[in-house]
């Protein structure tokens, strides 16, 4: 039978007065009183507990006192607190005006981004002027720097054609890539012939951009990549760079597929894709149709809306959940559609009219209800033929205004239905193309973008677009460059020639990249307090930059972008904003503030802080972005302002063990090449000494660093004297003392040789959580700031390498140093030590030998075989145990029964946390034994199906490649298999929830009995003074291993079909782009396409015939 746990008061010293102690404790702990009174079925505990309460308290007090003496002695925390206390008369504590701060940051960002826009505008002007002065020359011969061929030589040592010598030098400004800052180079995808007359004329014309690229870079040295993407397929990039093919020798990068090109070339659009899945579409035709749909989906972005309808005898929404609506074409929805398209099966007879009617109805309903893009609307009809022109449907739904464009894609080589398909497109302001091979799809699909761009081109509206955050892993091969988050500013380039005005010819798009890291430097970290931060989001509510955005995941030894890294919604990071008040205000571009109580995960989610955050936000003018700044209530609302002389501060800056936060911008060092090799500390010194008057520095931050250097300077002498007193023979213990200040200054002192430091990664970039970064203060600083004044927070660190995974190596202890002026308290610094894990254990076991008024051996000791002793931290992680394998693990893993009891008593609380950026393993699919039994015929048919499928696709691509070779292409004869499925990812994006356990500090001691079947297990818990640690002593004689362990494991949040559908259909509020160009009265709608000139090959025709003769179940 369960017994009621006993609680003892920290004020009760009379062990004999047991009931007095219990009621005293209940009076002081109303939570526990409620727990006791709420379950009257539990009998009281009778008899003397086997764990002596007073002895445990003595142990905790002794260990706590010894530990406090050790950490204060070696860290010098009392001295540092005194030095800041002495400086209080010269200090000011200023209350931060969050609204003014976010406005100032926004203005600075707007100024920076405006310079990028001006650079792009100058490129547009130069390109359009060059085109105006250029006459097309079909026989033009022109050599240019081909990015793939530059510096390449043939067997005789001569440069290959288009591959002349091109000087390349490593440049720190461009992530140490080898570039040529004097000129640009030109890249073409493998499927574009590098000597096609259109290419040669375009490349020749765009040579005029070279001096503009250079001039832009000289005017604004913070510019990164500048480029021009041509509508014909070539890509001119500055600075010039050597382009490396992939492992198959293929250049798959096509600038016309990039988000910046597509967004700049067209206005937002609503698209319904209709795909014929009747029996005539079997085999290769269906493969081409699927590839065409995938290519169309790749041209859509987060400002577009889409749905896909498959038709035969009936109309089928390929995602039934999306019936009757359009959904935002974000990455998740596009990928979902691609999976469903891949599963399409052919059967029946194609009835186009009902599919057209359904598409028109959707578009009409969305337009009338003010949903979707409220701009372009289009229907994409993908079929192998149309038996009529469906004029009645168009008369009813689209004429005479023709507000919905219809684009038709005739699949296959048959031309019987070409005239009808073209008629449909031409009479609905669309475009007709015939797609005979997989290779045709890319160029054919791109035509619709050029048609949609016509109104904008004719009107000469140069809209400026900014993309969502993205990583250009396709463009760059180095990990440093490819994993860098960017946004791109882009503008369209038009032909201004009068003779082609009605055709609305888009020449291409110019753009320039802005790294979000550089942009966020304009929100200096030191102005935001210990827990504060700045973040950016887009008009669609997606995160552009946020310290809690985790865009990468680890696959083996490599970091890879998560599939949905650039469509993480603000509500998925600031998930406490359940009413989406903050999100709604920010996407609407409002200026204001909002407050929330939040749970902030720390230490990779193992810990949590409870904070009240004030959010301040405003928009960034002339961009789709909004900026938010977060300040934490309490010490986060204040900023400390000190002052000292340059001479005194400069002297104290020059100590060899002093460093500054390398991620913070004390001085701008990345513009002038002479400054790029300087550390921030070196730059500050050069600035203060006047050696380099050209350096631009943040004078406020430099002033605070000088002040902190002066105040903390005595710590170096203190630590040095301490180190001299440690003999060589003394047993190893404390190895590092350290401090950090709110200005990013870091000092450390070693008490042992560097080779003997227990954790050598500490305070280095390898342990990012332990240093100041752009995103956060060090973990030890953040935790110390939330500890009661004068107390230390302890953390156990363990090895994570392959040699000794999970082995405890070090314990870190830190405490905050505060300053109070005029009743306002601010955190000035944090100070602490790193000690060996073994040293802490030795101190503990020594303290456990203490007992009261007893001569000789103690009656009880933690070394007794009938007792278990643990030291755990305030999140339940074991720092000390007799069993080393339990150290670093959650108490619930080591003793589930005890953790369960502590939770039920309210000593610990379970806090549920959510992760909406998680990656989960796919569920295992187990097949029944019957399913796994194949007949010989079934096995043969399966193999035959696979072989035939692969042969068909290979010969289809071989046929397409042959047609390019007939035109004289000299590119490598390797075709990019874009239709093939990528290797199945082991992990997929998901939502998870996980528990974090938090000690309730009001309960400093507790004891009780746990029922474990045939025995009772007693325990005592005692707070260790001036720390975040707890001592737990339990009775080992009672085996409670039958109790399940309590783990800190993340579990995937599973949504049933109904909830999942509701989530997929839901349209979160968003702000539409400010401009729309859907129609222009001067548009030449008769420029509406023609037939493909790709010729069939004999082997392909024969194999296609075989595909038609074979039963469809063999093919798909």
UniProtKB/Swiss-Prot annotation:
It is linked to Defects in Cacna2d4 are a cause of cone-rod dysfunction. Mice display affected retinal ribbon-type synapses. The retinopathy is accompanied by a substantial loss in the activities of the second-order neurons. Rod photoreceptor responses are maintained with reduced amplitude, whereas cone activities are absent. The chain crosses the membrane at residues 1095-1115. PROSITE patterns: VWFA. This is Voltage-dependent calcium channel subunit alpha-2/delta-4. It is found in: Membrane. Residues 466-559 form the Cache domain. The keyword Hydrolase does not apply. Its main location: membrane. GO terms for cellular component: monoatomic ion channel complex. A motif (MIDAS-like motif) lies at residues 276-280. Belongs to the calcium channel subunit alpha-2/delta family. Residues 1116 are cytoplasmic. It comes from Mus musculus. The gene is Cacna2d4. Pfam families: VGCC_alpha2 (PF08473), VWA_3 (PF13768), VWA_N (PF08399). Disulfide bonds join 426-1076. Dimer formed of alpha-2-2 and delta-2 chains; disulfide-linked. Voltage-dependent calcium channels are multisubunit complexes, consisting of alpha-1 (CACNA1), alpha-2 (CACNA2D), beta (CACNB) and delta (CACNA2D) subunits in a 1:1:1:1 ratio. Interacts with CACNA1C and CACNB3. Residues 48-1094 are extracellular. It comes from the Eukaryota.
